[in-house]
Amino acid sequence: MREYVLIFLVAPVFAAILGPYDIPPELPPLNDENFFDRSHSEYETVLTPEDFELGTRITAAMAHDNGDDIWDSDAMYSKDRFEGDIANDNLNASTAELFANGGSGKSEDGKWYNAIKNRLQLWPEGRIPYTISSQYSSYSRSLIAASMQEYASHTCIRWVPKEAADVNYVHIYPDRGCYSMVGKMGGKQSLSLGSGCIQKGIILHELMHAVGFFHEQSRTDRDDHITIMWNNIQAGMQGQFEKYGHGTIQSLGTGYDYGSIMHYGTKAFSRNGQPTMIPKKNGATIGQRNGFSKVDKFKINTLYGCPVEGEKPTTSAPTSGPIVITVKPVVITTGKPPVIQTVSPAVPLKPSECRNLRGDCDDLAKQGWCIRNPGWMRANCPISCGMCIPTKETQKPYVQTTTQAATTTARPQKPVTQPIQPLPPVPPLPPTTPEDCEDLRVDCLVLVSQRYCKISQNFMKSYCAKSCGFCFKPPPTEIPDNRPTVVTTRPLVTLPPAVIRSRSPAPPVSTTTKAAPTTSTTSAAPYSPTPLPSECSDRKHFCSHWKSAGFCEGIFMNYMKKNCPASCGLC
């Protein structure tokens, strides 16, 4: 049954990624090969901006499925792990209290909930360094990126790429099944997203374990809200349905949440296909894997001392969708001397609109993405790029030397969290051709230092060809022209006769023609404006969309120059 649901969900996703002109005749079979390749050499890497862009489009495509992404996976219910997917060593119902805080106690209302109490097991300032296995496919990386984006959008939890100074971090890799440790355990801790786990709701679930949460149905007050059908539980698995004792978990002032993404499904550990848990509230459903409930968001923000969003949302208005602005000179060619009209620099964002939507914005700014793709960074990381009107509540951005001075502001003690609308889908990424020979990953230099140019040549030729020195330029077939080339930052323009005659001619190309910097003319022919070259036209359907998304600059500039020169003004 799960395979049919997957086909229903993924079909529109492939259509959204490929576009209306590139839909394949039939989808590939949905198996593990679509999600990861365990035969590939395994090493630690991080997500890229392209993963987050693709994740946004996949999420938008799935939104058209009317929220039917609710199926629960058997991969979450391992007989060998505590409660099916908790990987902490020697953790069970009898040791959970000792694990959480080593003592006993009682909340004010006598109830215990599902967050750890020991503050040492929380991630400092909500910053969670991570690495991700190189074995995941682009589709899987994008869903993981979309899930991390959910945390950045609704909580102050920031999943950030691991840095050299980070000793404690989460490594995500495709082991057998789905599992995670609860909270920060110290050092490198594993989080598995293997077979049956590449689904956004399950990814959110496992990441929330790492944030510091147990399952909802293990609360002390759970018997007031659900009925456990003990006769339907697999033999020996009754211990997976124990409740936590006093002193084990944190009181966060919330009622029982049937809709929590941390709740078991109705048939967890079932021996006969019948429900093992039944809600006592009429019409309530459990085990949803659509996304955070309002209470989930409230609990995460409360546990980490963030401005609260969720069950008690803030009253600030949501921001509008990101506006991608590409500043390009506009050239008007007439019979008069040319007039260059330039668009004024992008207006700094208002404080109400200025918020980093990703946890790794500072890292991306340091890697130069504010310059390489300013449109995308303005929409996702305006604070880090200094694109905001300075206020006391604005974080300190990473300051770069650009044509527009960055605004330096003060970093607050705690990030300001505001509810926002889901990001709109972005246009498809332009494909990268081998002849462009550009690095397509931001961590290429790191991979080069780890000798992957030798041990994984095929992978590095595809993603880090420039850093590895795999770029190939064919020998010239014509005699090169050694005359100096004038490089200008302004587009080619056609000049009137008076301006042309005032310029000194370039060295003659033939006995009958004289070359000028921008216009060719003969001594006998009357003046006429030189038309644009016939090949200066867009060759792709999505050129205008790619331009508005900022792809005329950065790593895709060579591709856009070849395929979308008219839209990008690169003729």
From Swiss-Prot:
The active site is at 206. SUPFAM superfamilies: Metalloproteases ('zincins'), catalytic domain. Zn(2+) binds at residues 205, 209, 215. Residues 1-15 form the signal peptide. GO terms for biological process: proteolysis. Residues 407-420, 509-527 have a biased composition (Low complexity). Its cofactor is Zn(2+). It comes from the Eukaryota. Expressed in pharyngeal marginal cells and muscles. GO terms for cellular component: extracellular region. Its main location: secreted. Residues 407-426, 500-530 are annotated as: Disordered. It is an enzyme of class 3 (hydrolase). Glycans are attached at residue 92. Metalloprotease. This is Zinc metalloproteinase nas-15.
